[in-house]
């Protein structure tokens, strides 16, 4: 089986490829032949991609139709992680998010349709729903995105599902809660705070810090995505959550305690525009249909994540110096 994985030099995509290889080594899955397509933007790290004979890396843009067509011609299935994901950057540069997240997804869908490739697993986010005060969202909740990032992801979700409804393409959509774990680019809250605290620096906290997020270890996310790929139904949406809800203030307190420092290192900053107050996913469908359950205890997972960043300065220190530019240097010419 030939599997095309987009965005697999990034945080979640690379962990997914590792997940597949580990499942193969343990005999849980037949060995796939994996092609990774990644543009290597500022957040892409070629070293994240496993150095394995089963994995081929192709540097390229998902919006490059001829390239995508040539790769899709050799593929049996697709798992699509590639996306611009940072909310703050989407507010200042929305065009980049529309081009990659919407137009890039369209290019992939067109090529998959031409070559009869499926399933096409489209990986998305809980942010497409907006904000929920109480309870949790089911998969049929109407989308109400509040940032250019989440609007671009909502658009790509709807586009992907339309290819199933219009053309019969085997599209399956996953929507996850906030991820954390090793190899996460240090612009996101957990690695930003952890690396700042390791360096004795201050950490920023938006607004009153009472925005609530549900936390999901990246390995549990990868487990859920692969269950959808192998057992999910065409045209369906599945939620993949971690089950641990924390305010940003609570999360900050946990990280401060882990480093033995007080709140005097926290800088309150003005709240982000359109900052969603609370996210929460109802994951009963994935549990009932696929047997999905998160396996990682949050306290253990966050402790191991801190240890990983403490032990891997050589990975994250160069990344914190990178400008948020169009692309990182290729292998051999950079960190």
Curated annotation (Swiss-Prot):
<dbReference type="InterPro" id="IPR020904">
    <property type="entry name" value="Sc_DH/Rdtase_CS"/>
</dbReference>
<keyword id="KW-0520">NAD</keyword>
<dbReference type="GO" id="GO:0008460">
    <property type="term" value="F:dTDP-glucose 4,6-dehydratase activity"/>
</dbReference>
<feature type="active site" description="Proton donor">
    <location>
        <position position="126"/>
    </location>
</feature>
<comment type="function">
    <text>Involved in the biosynthesis of the two 2,6-deoxysugars, dTDP-L-oleandrose and dTDP-D-desosamine, attached to the macrolactone ring oleandolide to produce the aglycone antibiotic oleandomycin. Catalyzes the dehydration of dTDP-D-glucose to form dTDP-6-deoxy-D-xylo-4-hexulose via a three-step process involving oxidation, dehydration and reduction.</text>
</comment>
<dbReference type="Pfam" id="PF16363">
    <property type="entry name" value="GDP_Man_Dehyd"/>
</dbReference>
<feature type="binding site">
    <location>
        <position position="179"/>
    </location>
    <ligand>
        <name>NAD(+)</name>
    </ligand>
</feature>
<feature type="binding site">
    <location>
        <position position="248"/>
    </location>
    <ligand>
        <name>substrate</name>
    </ligand>
</feature>
<feature type="binding site">
    <location>
        <begin position="188"/>
        <end position="189"/>
    </location>
    <ligand>
        <name>substrate</name>
    </ligand>
</feature>
<feature type="binding site">
    <location>
        <begin position="38"/>
        <end position="41"/>
    </location>
    <ligand>
        <name>NAD(+)</name>
    </ligand>
</feature>
<keyword id="KW-0456">Lyase</keyword>
<dbReference type="InterPro" id="IPR005888">
    <property type="entry name" value="dTDP_Gluc_deHydtase"/>
</dbReference>
<feature type="binding site">
    <location>
        <begin position="81"/>
        <end position="85"/>
    </location>
    <ligand>
        <name>NAD(+)</name>
    </ligand>
</feature>
<feature type="active site" description="Proton acceptor">
    <location>
        <position position="149"/>
    </location>
</feature>
<feature type="binding site">
    <location>
        <position position="85"/>
    </location>
    <ligand>
        <name>substrate</name>
    </ligand>
</feature>
<comment type="similarity">
    <text>Belongs to the NAD(P)-dependent epimerase/dehydratase family. dTDP-glucose dehydratase subfamily.</text>
</comment>
<dbReference type="GO" id="GO:0016491">
    <property type="term" value="F:oxidoreductase activity"/>
</dbReference>
<dbReference type="GO" id="GO:0017000">
    <property type="term" value="P:antibiotic biosynthetic process"/>
</dbReference>
<feature type="binding site">
    <location>
        <begin position="61"/>
        <end position="62"/>
    </location>
    <ligand>
        <name>NAD(+)</name>
    </ligand>
</feature>
<protein>
    <recommendedName>
        <fullName>dTDP-glucose 4,6-dehydratase</fullName>
        <ecNumber>4.2.1.46</ecNumber>
    </recommendedName>
</protein>
<dbReference type="GO" id="GO:0009225">
    <property type="term" value="P:nucleotide-sugar metabolic process"/>
</dbReference>
<keyword id="KW-0045">Antibiotic biosynthesis</keyword>
<feature type="binding site">
    <location>
        <begin position="11"/>
        <end position="12"/>
    </location>
    <ligand>
        <name>NAD(+)</name>
    </ligand>
</feature>
<feature type="binding site">
    <location>
        <position position="125"/>
    </location>
    <ligand>
        <name>substrate</name>
    </ligand>
</feature>
<comment type="pathway">
    <text>Antibiotic biosynthesis.</text>
</comment>
<feature type="active site" description="Proton acceptor">
    <location>
        <position position="127"/>
    </location>
</feature>
<dbReference type="InterPro" id="IPR036291">
    <property type="entry name" value="NAD(P)-bd_dom_sf"/>
</dbReference>
<feature type="binding site">
    <location>
        <position position="178"/>
    </location>
    <ligand>
        <name>substrate</name>
    </ligand>
</feature>
<feature type="binding site">
    <location>
        <begin position="271"/>
        <end position="275"/>
    </location>
    <ligand>
        <name>substrate</name>
    </ligand>
</feature>
<dbReference type="InterPro" id="IPR016040">
    <property type="entry name" value="NAD(P)-bd_dom"/>
</dbReference>
<feature type="binding site">
    <location>
        <begin position="149"/>
        <end position="153"/>
    </location>
    <ligand>
        <name>NAD(+)</name>
    </ligand>
</feature>
<feature type="binding site">
    <location>
        <begin position="204"/>
        <end position="206"/>
    </location>
    <ligand>
        <name>substrate</name>
    </ligand>
</feature>
<feature type="binding site">
    <location>
        <position position="100"/>
    </location>
    <ligand>
        <name>NAD(+)</name>
    </ligand>
</feature>
<feature type="binding site">
    <location>
        <position position="213"/>
    </location>
    <ligand>
        <name>substrate</name>
    </ligand>
</feature>
């Amino acid at each position: 089986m030939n599997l095309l994985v987009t965005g697999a030099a990034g945080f979640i995509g690379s962990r997914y490829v590792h997940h597949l290889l580990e499942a193969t080594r343990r005999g849980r899955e037949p060995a796939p032949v994996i092609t990774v397509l990644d543009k290597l933007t500022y957040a892409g790290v070629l070293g994240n991609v496993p150095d394995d004979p089963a994995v081929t890396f192709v540097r390229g843009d998902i919006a490059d139709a001829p390239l995508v067509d040539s790769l899709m011609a050799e593929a049996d299935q697709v798992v699509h992680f590639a996306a611009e994901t940072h909310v703050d950057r989407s507010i200042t540069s929305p065009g980049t998010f529309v081009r990659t997240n919407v137009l890039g997804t369209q290019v992939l869908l067109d090529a998959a349709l031409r070559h009869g490739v499926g399933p096409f697993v489209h990986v998305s986010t809980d942010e497409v729903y907006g904000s929920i005060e109480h309870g949790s969202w089911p998969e049929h909740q109407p989308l109400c995105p509040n940032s250019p990032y989440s609007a671009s992801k909502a658009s790509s979700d709807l586009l992907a599902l339309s290819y199933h409804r219009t053309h019969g393409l085997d599209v399956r959509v996953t929507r996850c809660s906030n991820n954390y774990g090793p190899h996460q680019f240090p612009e996101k809250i957990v690695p930003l705070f952890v690396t700042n605290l390791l360096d004795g620096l201050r950490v920023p906290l938006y607004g009153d810090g009472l925005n609530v997020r549900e936390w999901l270890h990246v390995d549990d996310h990868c487990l859920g995505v692969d269950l959808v790929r192998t057992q999910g139904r065409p045209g369906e949406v599945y939620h993949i959550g971690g089950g641990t809800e924390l305010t940003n203030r609570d999360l900050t307190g946990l990280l401060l305690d882990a480093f033995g420092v007080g709140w005097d290192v926290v800088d309150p900053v003005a709240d982000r525009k359109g900052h969603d107050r609370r996210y929460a996913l109802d994951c009963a469908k994935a549990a009932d249909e696929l047997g999905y359950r998160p396996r990682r205890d949050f306290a253990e997972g966050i402790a191991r994540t801190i240890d990983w960043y403490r032990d891997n300065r050589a990975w994250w220190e160069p990344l914190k110096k990178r400008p948020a530019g169009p692309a990182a240097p290729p292998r051999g010419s950079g960190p």
